[in-house]
Amino acid sequence: DYKQSVITEAVTKGLNLDVELVPSGIDWIGDVPKEWEITRVKFYGTIRSGDGISIEKIKDEGTYPVWGGNGLIGYSEKYNESKTSIVIGRVGALCGNVRLLTSPTFVSDNALIFRLSDKVDSKYMLWLLIGADLNRLNTSNAQPLITGTKVKNVFIPLPSLSEQQSIATYLDTKCSEIDSLIAIKQQKIETLKDYKKSVIYEAVTGKMTIGETP
C-alpha cells in the first residue's frame, strides 16, 4: 500500500533525490545510495525468543504489557525485557510485525526480542524492518511462523548514523500524517454506512417515500 511504499522508499533510497544510486543485488532493497553499506540484521544486536507465560498470569489490566505473536495480548505483573529493543511477532497470521519497546515489557515465546546495539538508531531499525516486510519470511503451510535465524540473516541497507536519524524523524512525521488521513477517511466511510442504513430503514418502514430525502 501507499504507506508501505513510502517507508520502503525512505529506508532504501534515503531523502536526497540527487544522490547516486547503485544496484544492491538484493531484491527487496533494489538500488541504494552509493555510500550506503549493505549488511545483515545479525550484526546490529542479538535476537532471542521471548518466554512462556501462563494464561492465568495475563490480565486485562496490569503493570507491564504482554506482547505475543500478533501484538498486545494483555498485562502482567512481571517483565522479561527492560532494554530498548524491537519485538517481532514470531507465530501467527501477523508474524513479522514489529514494535519498538522503550519500557519494561513481557514478551511471550510467540515473539522475538531484538536487543539493539548502539551502532544503529533504534527508530531507523524499526522502520527498516517494517520496510523489509518480515512476514515474507514465513514459509509454513500450516501455522504461520518465522525464525530468529531467518530474521538475523535478512540483508539491510545502512547509511550513516546521522542519516538514519534523519530518515527515522521523516518517517515518524510522514506516517503519522498518513495514519491521520486514513482515520479521517475511515470515519467518513462509517458515516456514509450509517446514512445508508438510515435510508434503507426509512424506506422499508414506510417512513420515507421514493424521491424524498430523509
Regions found by a protein language model. Name each.
Residues 54-58, 137-142, 183:
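A short, aromatic/hydrophobic, helix- or strand-capping loop or linear motif
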